[in-house]
UniProtKB/Swiss-Prot annotation:
Family of this protein: Belongs to the SIMIBI class G3E GTPase family. UreG subfamily.
GO biological process: urea catabolic process
Keyword hit for Cytoplasm: yes
Taxonomy, superkingdom: Bacteria
Cystine crosslinks: none
Gene source species: Photorhabdus laumondii subsp. laumondii (strain DSM 15139 / CIP 105565 / TT01)
Record's subunit section: Homodimer. UreD, UreF and UreG form a complex that acts as a GTP-hydrolysis-dependent molecular chaperone, activating the urease apoprotein by helping to assemble the nickel containing metallocenter of UreC. The UreE protein probably delivers the nickel.
Gene3D superfamilies cross-referenced by the UniProt entry: P-loop containing nucleotide triphosphate hydrolases
Annotated Gene Ontology cellular component terms: cytoplasm
One term of GO molecular function: GTP binding
Protein name: Urease accessory protein UreG
Matches recorded under InterPro entries: CobW/HypB/UreG_nucleotide-bd, P-loop_NTPase, UreG
Function: Facilitates the functional incorporation of the urease nickel metallocenter. This process requires GTP hydrolysis, probably effectuated by UreG.
Gene of this entry: ureG
């Protein structure tokens, strides 16, 4: 049976997790990748509805599923990811020719990480408007992520944030782990992010699955 890569996408409330999914999905499809999308909210499925509206005509809405976790966001993707695992398995069974499942967590703090039982890799999204000190806070979510996305870079001059400082601090806390600066409104950095996903997640994981 084909192994479908599972990629978690986490980060604080409002950092742009949903926006990242909305901008990378069309590019993945253009490159021949068949995605599924699962979003998490605590008491609604609002993110799934938003993604369906944005990707209408691009991705079949049946391939977008909202999970109402009713619990702390990191609990639903780390301590007890059973609800999300069930959702992933359901979607994979319905669409077995898919290549990747994008699993968006609910918005949480810098401690959010994904259980390896749920995600093969994970991306952590922060945004410039949270302040340039965010990388220095050294939370496990942003430090351990396979890719760190620093989003909303256009807002830096409006909040007094230095992108150079954020990049320096990111390199200090993450070492050689990759990161990317993005603006989901203009598309800046998005193609590079997709290249990283294709190279580091999809291609590598597909090779491992066939060995």
């Amino acid at each position: 049976m084909k192994k479908i890569t599972r990629i978690g996408i986490g980060g604080p409330v409002g950092s742009g997790k949903t926006a990242v999914i909305e901008v990378i999905t069309p590019i993945l499809i253009q490159r021949g990748i068949k995605p599924l999308i699962i979003t998490n909210d605590i008491v609604t499925t609002e993110d799934a509805k938003q993604v369906k509206r944005t990707l209408k005509g691009i991705l079949d809405e049946e391939k977008i599923l909202g999970v109402e976790t009713g619990a702390c966001p990191h609990t639903a993707v780390r301590e007890d990811p059973s609800m999300n695992i069930a959702a992933v398995e359901e979607m994979e069974a319905r669409f077995p020719d898919s290549d990747v499942v994008l699993i968006e967590s609910g918005g949480d703090n810098l401690t959010l990480t994904f259980s390896p039982a749920l995600a093969d890799f994970y991306i952590y999204v922060i945004d410039v408007a949270e302040g340039e000190k965010i990388p220095r806070k050294n939370g496990p979510g942003l430090v351990q992520a396979d890719i760190l996305v620093i989003n909303k870079i256009d807002l830096a001059p409006y909040v007094g944030a230095s992108l150079a400082v954020m990049e320096h601090d990111t390199q200090v806390v993450r070492g050689q782990r990759p990161y990317i600066l993005t603006n989901c409104k203009t598309g800046e950095g998005v193609e590079t992010l997709v290249n990283m996903i294709m190279r580091d997640f999809l291609f590598t994981h597909s090779l491992q699955a066939t060995q």
